[in-house]
């Protein structure tokens, strides 16, 4: 169970980082 929760947290974290970087890239383009 804890492993599953950690996996979910890691996935959410990675997706958040990707969104952050994409937003920064978008703002730099404009």
Swiss-Prot record:
It is found in: Mitochondrion inner membrane. The keyword Membrane applies. The chain crosses the membrane at residues 7-27. Keywords: Electron transport, Membrane, Mitochondrion, Mitochondrion inner membrane, NAD, Respiratory chain, Translocase, Transmembrane, Transmembrane helix, Transport, Ubiquinone. Its main location: mitochondrion. Its EC number is 7.1.1.2. It catalyses: a ubiquinone + NADH + 5 H(+)(in) = a ubiquinol + NAD(+) + 4 H(+)(out). The keyword Transmembrane applies. GO terms for molecular function: NADH dehydrogenase (ubiquinone) activity. Belongs to the complex I subunit 5 family. This is NADH-ubiquinone oxidoreductase chain 5. It comes from Pisaster ochraceus (Ochre sea star).
């Amino acid at each position: 169970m804890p492993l599953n929760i950690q996996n979910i947290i890691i996935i959410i974290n990675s997706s958040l980082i990707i969104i952050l970087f994409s937003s920064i890239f978008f703002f730099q383009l404009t």
